[in-house]
Amino acid sequence: MDIEKIVTEVISAVRYDKKMTLSLARELSRRMTEEGEKNGNKLVIAIVDEKARPVLTEVMDGAFLVSHPVATRKAYTSVAIKMSTAKLAEEVGKGGSLEGLDTADGLIFLGGGAPLVVNGNVIGGIG
């Protein structure tokens, strides 16, 4: 699932206020759920605002219990570091530009989290 592509498409299609809104979060969640169902994935979708405060969390039927805290941490991490968690996972490894950051509390280094960027500004994150 290409989370960054979905984020870009939704942000382009939805009217936004340069800030995270519940309607934007709902549309992102709807698209992620649609994609998850199409691929047979049972997702937890966590969306936060620019300060990593929860805006929306949805749990698909049959999602793993561990998916809830993981999705929340992915959304938080993507806002805190302002990059996708997949890219971050590459950068924290030996010789990466963020080597050693993997000891920071609260961050997660698994793909599936992405910042929500509008006109160069991070307005939130999704995990």
Locate predicted features.
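Flexible, solvent-exposed loop/hinge segments and secondary-structure transition points
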Residues: 2-127
